Each structure stands twice: as C-alpha cells, then as structure tokens.
Amino acid sequence: MAIERTLSIIKPDAVAKNVIGQIYARFEAAGLKVVAAKMTHLSQGEAEAFYAVHKERPFFKDLVSFMISGPVMIQALEGEGAVLKNRDLMGATDPKKADAGTIRADFADSIDANAVHGSDAVETAREEIAFFFAGMNVYSR
C-alpha cells in the first residue's frame, strides 16, 4: 500500500473536551505520523472557503458556525493508506451509526458536533493540506 498524506481536523467540540491527546494516540497506534500540526481559531472566511464544496447544502451555515465556535487542531497525517486508515479511525459521520471504538463513537455528540474531519480522497487531501499548510513545511518522518 502506498504512503499517503491526509488532512485531519479535531473540531471545536473535541478540543473543548480536551481529548486531543487521546485522538493523537489513536493516529499513532494505527501507524499514522503527524507531519504538520497547528491549533487555530478559524475565521468565518476560512471556514466558508474550506467547506465551499458544501455551499449549496442546507447544513452549510450551521457547519461554518460550528467550525468557528472555538479552536480547532489541524494536522497532516502520513502513512500507508492514510486516507482510508484515518476514515476508519473516525467512524461514520453520524456518531450514532459509528462503530464502537471509533473516534466519533467515543467523542462525538451529534452529526453536527462530530469531533473530527478527514479528507475523503488522496487528491482532496492534497488540496486540504495546501489550504491549511500553504508555505509551511510538512515533514516526512
């Protein structure tokens, strides 16, 4: 399997619960390495630009409002099959449907406050990493 990179965001609800370390431990236990990371409080413009693909969806405004409601932890992860591996770790978007032991089953409150974001494909991951880490170094380890 190929070494890939994927973008992960620990959303405001999970940051507020102080579970960043527990989530990082799951990444590392699954063989994913953090190759870039930063904590930030997204502006409305940043959140709207990042989630622009959802602009016409009925949940867009609520998603943007939620994503700017508190700080987020953003990281680029690297490892074999990183995109799928991270999606497996996250679990289903709706935590009620997420398998036991996944990040969302353990830490998410609702389909809106669902703890984490992860890239859905290698190409999307490239774009998302460039969005948040433009001009910053991303280090393979």
UniProtKB/Swiss-Prot annotation:
Binding locations of ATP: K11, F59, R87, T93, R104, N114
EC supergroup of this enzyme: transferase
SMART domains referenced in this protein's UniProt entry, alphabetically: NDK (SM00562)
Record-linked Gene3D superfamilies: Nucleoside diphosphate kinase-like domain
Membrane spanning residue stretches: none
Compartments in which it is found: Cytoplasm
BP GO annotations: CTP biosynthetic process; GTP biosynthetic process; UTP biosynthetic process
Any single GO CC term annotated in Swiss-Prot or TrEMBL for this entry: cytoplasm
Keywords from the UniProt entry: ATP-binding, Cytoplasm, Kinase, Magnesium, Metal-binding, Nucleotide metabolism, Nucleotide-binding, Phosphoprotein, Transferase
Active site: H117
Protein origin, superkingdom: Bacteria
Catalytic activity: a 2'-deoxyribonucleoside 5'-diphosphate + ATP = a 2'-deoxyribonucleoside 5'-triphosphate + ADP; a ribonucleoside 5'-diphosphate + ATP = a ribonucleoside 5'-triphosphate + ADP
Necessary cofactors: Mg(2+)
SUPFAM superfamilies, A to Z: Nucleoside diphosphate kinase, NDK
Single GO molecular function: metal ion binding
Predominant location category: cytoplasm
Coiled-coil ranges from the UniProt annotation: none
Role description: Major role in the synthesis of nucleoside triphosphates other than ATP. The ATP gamma phosphate is transferred to the NDP beta phosphate via a ping-pong mechanism, using a phosphorylated active-site intermediate.
Family: Belongs to the NDK family.
Assembly: Homotetramer.
The protein, known as: Nucleoside diphosphate kinase
Originating organism: Polaromonas naphthalenivorans (strain CJ2)
